Amino acid sequence: MSKQLVSIIDVPKHIGEEITIGAWVANKSGKGKIAFLQLRDGTAFFQGVAFKPNFIEKFGEEEGLEKFDTIKHLSQETSIYVTGMVKEDERSKFGYELDITDIEVIGKSQDYPITPKEHGTDFLMDNRHLWLRSRKQMAIQQIRNAIIYATYDFFDKNGFIKFDSPILSSNAAEDSTELFETDYFGTPAFLSQSGQLYLEAGAMALGRVFDFGPVFRAEKSKTRRHLTEFWMMDAEYSFLSHDESLDLQEAYVKALIQGAIDRAPQALEILERDVDLLKKYIAEPFKRVSYDEAIDLLQAHENDEDTDYEHLEHGDDFGSPHETWISNYFGVPTFVVNYPASFKAFYMKPVPGNPERVLCADLLAPEGYGEIIGGSMREDDYDALVAKMEELGMDRSEYEFYLDLRKYGSVPHGGFGIGIERMVTFVAGTKHIREAIPFPRMLHRIKP
């Protein structure tokens, strides 16, 4: 049997040709003289059909019956080389199918644990290495791949340079209570929460930089939106205003959505994602509302029949129900800007004339997906940043390199970060972030 293989996703290019596919058996059916195989090879799913008389005619009765019997008794996830003629077939949901003419078993699969029936989440997570083979899980990973590809493409086209920040650090970029600590040859070190502080150094050297890699948050949270290890894209840029930053973030998110539509249409179809709704998010401008305007809206509607969130005062932080209501109210991704300085990071630049608010923005995704981007203008004045750190009781010695950036040619600059898993969850339309990464790390899960 020829081993010049054709990927399933390329099968439509070979109508009327005999081809060979390397695949796994996802499922099978049939009776009597006919057998149907549901095949997958990582690129897509496909159906093959085998007819007993055709095998007897081609190989003779003994060998033909043996090969057909092999097909009928293939178990789930057996790996095979399958050869056949690609034929158009309107009855097939693919529009074509493979008329199987030969088969070769590569690797047998006995007692595959994830059978085509309902399984509990814990069981599926314990068998995550196998669950990834299922149709929906494959689709989610294909969307993840499309979003990562679109990330690199977007930043390259917009003049950004890939800049790799360290994973081990001696300081905290975000909440110091959420750090994973390790011993670095006798010195305390921490797994990175964000590459932002180092990216600011990159922006002062290269103008526009971005980083993409794993980050770690020791959050004792069991919500559907939190992981302890996830992949973050951080971008930093010099000589860009707050409004220009929001424009860039909006363009980036739209590019990610478009990238998934262009590169993973079959995956979106498998997940039954409303593509027209995704296209609406691309076509319409994102809404921008200030934190204080958002609080006013929440207070004005808190007694509405369909609301389900707690009362907030100005100065309170949003919870997930508040974020959901705000984004659903506007119906498109919504930037909430200028939050109180009291619960935002030390490095954020105050709003001119209003030191109680900072030049920052969170992008809230509709449909209940909440925050997907956080960004801000960074404090570029040395004395102001030192004063803020002293106010918070921070140890300046751990941030000397960061303060140096304000001493030697400081410029207006800002940046933002996006957790790729949250974006994948939003674009894919899935309910839980654990499915947006191959092997999720959560509060009570570190295996497999």
Swiss-Prot record:
<dbReference type="InterPro" id="IPR002312">
    <property type="entry name" value="Asp/Asn-tRNA-synth_IIb"/>
</dbReference>
<comment type="similarity">
    <text>Belongs to the class-II aminoacyl-tRNA synthetase family.</text>
</comment>
<dbReference type="GO" id="GO:0004816">
    <property type="term" value="F:asparagine-tRNA ligase activity"/>
</dbReference>
<dbReference type="InterPro" id="IPR004364">
    <property type="entry name" value="Aa-tRNA-synt_II"/>
</dbReference>
<dbReference type="GO" id="GO:0016740">
    <property type="term" value="F:transferase activity"/>
</dbReference>
<dbReference type="GO" id="GO:0140096">
    <property type="term" value="F:catalytic activity, acting on a protein"/>
</dbReference>
<dbReference type="GO" id="GO:0005524">
    <property type="term" value="F:ATP binding"/>
</dbReference>
<keyword id="KW-0067">ATP-binding</keyword>
<comment type="subunit">
    <text>Homodimer.</text>
</comment>
<dbReference type="InterPro" id="IPR006195">
    <property type="entry name" value="aa-tRNA-synth_II"/>
</dbReference>
<dbReference type="GO" id="GO:0003676">
    <property type="term" value="F:nucleic acid binding"/>
</dbReference>
<dbReference type="GO" id="GO:0006421">
    <property type="term" value="P:asparaginyl-tRNA aminoacylation"/>
</dbReference>
<dbReference type="InterPro" id="IPR004365">
    <property type="entry name" value="NA-bd_OB_tRNA"/>
</dbReference>
<keyword id="KW-0436">Ligase</keyword>
<dbReference type="InterPro" id="IPR004522">
    <property type="entry name" value="Asn-tRNA-ligase"/>
</dbReference>
<keyword id="KW-0648">Protein biosynthesis</keyword>
<dbReference type="GO" id="GO:0005737">
    <property type="term" value="C:cytoplasm"/>
</dbReference>
<keyword id="KW-0030">Aminoacyl-tRNA synthetase</keyword>
<protein>
    <recommendedName>
        <fullName>Asparagine--tRNA ligase</fullName>
        <ecNumber>6.1.1.22</ecNumber>
    </recommendedName>
</protein>
<dbReference type="Pfam" id="PF01336">
    <property type="entry name" value="tRNA_anti-codon"/>
</dbReference>
<dbReference type="Pfam" id="PF00152">
    <property type="entry name" value="tRNA-synt_2"/>
</dbReference>
<keyword id="KW-0547">Nucleotide-binding</keyword>
<dbReference type="InterPro" id="IPR045864">
    <property type="entry name" value="aa-tRNA-synth_II/BPL/LPL"/>
</dbReference>
<keyword id="KW-0963">Cytoplasm</keyword>
<dbReference type="InterPro" id="IPR012340">
    <property type="entry name" value="NA-bd_OB-fold"/>
</dbReference>
